[in-house]
Structures are given as structure tokens and as C-alpha cells.
Amino acid sequence: MHRRQFMTAAALAAASLTASTAFSAESADAVVKAYVEAWNAHDSAKAASYFAEKVVYYDASVGKPIEGREAAKAGVIDNFLNAVPDAVWKVKGEPIVQGDRVAFEWEFSGTNTGKWADGTAATGKKFSFAGASVFDTKDGKIASQSDYYDALGFFKQLGLM
């Protein structure tokens, strides 16, 4: 009798853990997908709403993380959407989802018709470059985002190098 109760409890615990992991992965993927959709709708407020209050955004080409939702919104989302009002962020292939972590390759393209936050004037040039991003989510929000891409190629396309 005790063995049957133990086996039932063990089976329920395993099912609960599996369901929890699956839900977590689906939630992480859904949050990141909605975030990318907000970028492509050029809605910086909505995109930033997917960030945790204390999000850490890391751009490998810059080398220094930006911390906090408002700082990431201003320094990344607003910066790019103001400088590239026709920006398109295209996910290539299916994202890799593992628990609360999501990673995917992408292509970012558009025309630089606006001024960059650092004061660099618009070049009027079209560009397209590839990269990859890794996201960590927590409680339905993006806790961290790390972007890796060919910054030199991007700057050359803009005529800045």
C-alpha cells in the first residue's frame, strides 16, 4: 500500500515538474516573440514593457551593459527606432528555448534616416546585418538580453568606417 502511494506521489511530482518546465519554456518564447513584434511595430514603449525593471542589456560590440528598463529603452530601443524608423528585426529559423532562456539568430535591416543618440548624423544609407541574441526571462519578463553581431560590417554599410 505504501509503495502505491509513493509511486503515485512520485508520478504526480514528475508530471508537475514537466508541466512547469514546459510552461516556463512556452512563456519565455512567448515573451520574446511579443518583444520582437513590438520592435517591428516600432512601439518602443510596448517593447520596453517586456523588460524586467532591473533588466541587463548587453551589446557585445559596446562591451558595457546597460542596466534598468528605462535606460535600456532610451539607450537601445529608442536609439535604434529613432535612427532607423523603418527597422525590421527578422528572426531566422526557430528560436532555441531551454527553460527560461531563449536564443535565436536574426537579421536587422533598415535605412538610417534619423540621428543616433550619440549625435551621429543620419547617413541615409540602407543596411542589413546578421546577429544572434540570448534572452533570460524571469516571471514573464526579460531579465537580460545579450546581442552579438558584426558591428564593423554594420558601420561600414552606414559609411561610418
Which residues does each predicted region cover?
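A short gly/proline-enriched turn/hairpin at secondary-structure junctions
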Residues: 50, 56-67, 80-84
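Short, low-complexity N-terminal intrinsically disordered segments enriched in polar/charged residues
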Residues: 2-53, 161
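Short, flexible active-site loop motifs that bind/organize anionic cofactors or intermediates
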Residues: 34-37, 62, 144
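Residue-level signal for alpha-helical context at structural boundaries
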Residues: 46, 53, 64-66, 73, ...
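A beta-strand edge to alpha-helix "cap/lid" segment located at domain peripheries
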Residues: 8, 12, 17, 23, ...
